[in-house]
Design a protein with these regions (language model features):
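Gly/Ser/Thr/Pro-rich low-complexity, intrinsically disordered segments
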Residues: 1-164
Length: 164
């Protein structure tokens, strides 16, 4: 680990803990999601054409196939029901968000649901206090930690576009 290199997985709010087992979700200039294995540097991700990146946990579905390695990467939360925030992209390029409130879903239950929905790609951002979803002015997920929730340095926004 070269401290001169900026890693997406270093979160200064968590004491600069290097999360070298988590995957990064990149978003390229066309708006397509791209998955990066642990320890890709921010420079490498930018050089690969991504303009944004989000660190959550792990992919659940890649190219329509279940990604089960995440169960061992995140053993403290993968095998028990937990609130989930899952984002993905459909074959036509549309995004989707799957929000599961408490008691939540396991990774496997999430994968089973996503497979039934025939999604090509799904990424678990987290759940509980680490992610919050607001749809227009309505909060879909409750605050699970403190009064205002955990301070999260990353925000993803999805804005509707009009199709002519």
């Amino acid at each position: 680990y070269d401290r001169k290199e900026t890693y997406i997985h270093v979160n200064p709010n968590d004491g600069d803990e290097k999360r070298d087992v988590l995957y990064t979700l990149g978003i390229n200039k066309s708006g397509d999601f791209k998955m990066y294995k642990p320890c890709f540097s921010a420079k490498e991700i930018l050089n690969d054409g991504c303009q944004d990146a989000v660190m959550g946990f792990v992919p659940l579905i890649i190219d329509y196939e279940e990604f089960k390695d995440g169960d061992d990467i995140v053993p403290y939360g993968s095998r028990i029901d937990k609130p989930r925030q899952i984002v993905g992209q459909l074959k036509n390029g549309d995004y989707y968000i799957l929000t599961a409130k408490a008691p939540g879903l396991t990774f496997q239950t999430s994968r089973d649901l996503l497979k039934k929905l025939d999604v090509p790609f799904a990424y678990d951002l987290d759940g509980g206090s680490s992610t919050q979803t607001t749809f227009f002015d309505e909060r879909l997920t409750p605050v699970y930690r403190d009064v205002t929730g955990r301070k999260i340095p990353t925000i993803m926004t999805f804005e509707p576009i009009e199709i002519a």
